[in-house]
Amino acid sequence: MRSIANKKLVIATHNIGKLQEITTLVAPFGLTIQSAKELGLPEPKETGTTFEENAYIKAFAAAKNTGLPALSDDSGLEVDALNGAPGVYTADLALQSDGTRDFLKAMQKIEEKLQKIGAHKKSQRKCRFISVICIAWPDAHADYFHGRVEGSFIWPPRGDKGFGFDPVFLPDGYKNTFGEMTTEQKHGWKLNDQTPLSHRACAFKLLAENLLKLS
């Protein structure tokens, strides 16, 4: 498994919320980072059918265009009662005709589907967030790191922190949704300290221990 020798890394995302979270996680490692948006890179079409495929598409596109290693996160929400949907298509569920994303409408769509099948109890609303982090190099080499967190889909949404589906995700064993947690509480992890909570922090801990050669 490679290391990031030159300490330069491109974050392959145009999602402001995701960029902020990744930047927070990367901060302790002394890397010089730039985002795909800052560099004016186009957003590649996510044509993959798995989190791994879409993470690679984004990371390799940025690496190829910059000549630097690039990190991408592809993540989504899997709801058991909906046979794992929306899954890899989570972000697409929020996509509007004008190209913007409305996550409140997306959350409402999931709630309507759960209501339609009679999934009213918390025990019927089990779900999880999945994160796959890919770091790709210009020569097409890639490393992957996986994370997940179990919880329940709650309604109505609670909290105005975080982004995406955070307000409707209640992690197992907690009273607050991700939307009610600070970034630090949501991640639940710092270098050499604590066990990670969020799916993204779980994946990043593996990245830190293996690719960044830290523990």
From Swiss-Prot:
GO terms for biological process: nucleotide metabolic process; purine nucleoside triphosphate catabolic process. It is an enzyme of class 3 (hydrolase). Binds 1 Mg(2+) ion per subunit. Its cofactor is Mg(2+). One of its GO terms (cellular component) is cytosol. The keyword Metal-binding applies. It catalyses: XTP + H2O = XMP + diphosphate + H(+); dITP + H2O = dIMP + diphosphate + H(+); ITP + H2O = IMP + diphosphate + H(+). The active site is at 74 (proton acceptor). Pfam families: Ham1p_like. InterPro entries: dITP/XTP_pyrophosphatase, ITPase-like_fam, RdgB/HAM1. Mg(2+) binds at residue 74. Its EC number is 3.6.1.66. GO terms for molecular function: dITP diphosphatase activity; ITP diphosphatase activity; metal ion binding; nucleotide binding; ribonucleoside triphosphate phosphatase activity; XTP diphosphatase activity. Keywords: Hydrolase, Magnesium, Metal-binding, Nucleotide metabolism, Nucleotide-binding. Substrate binds at residues 13-18, 75, 163-166, 186, 199-200. Pyrophosphatase that catalyzes the hydrolysis of nucleoside triphosphates to their monophosphate derivatives, with a high preference for the non-canonical purine nucleotides XTP (xanthosine triphosphate), dITP (deoxyinosine triphosphate) and ITP. Seems to function as a house-cleaning enzyme that removes non-canonical purine nucleotides from the nucleotide pool, thus preventing their incorporation into DNA/RNA and avoiding chromosomal lesions. Homodimer. Belongs to the HAM1 NTPase family. This is dITP/XTP pyrophosphatase. It comes from Bartonella henselae (strain ATCC 49882 / DSM 28221 / CCUG 30454 / Houston 1) (Rochalimaea henselae).
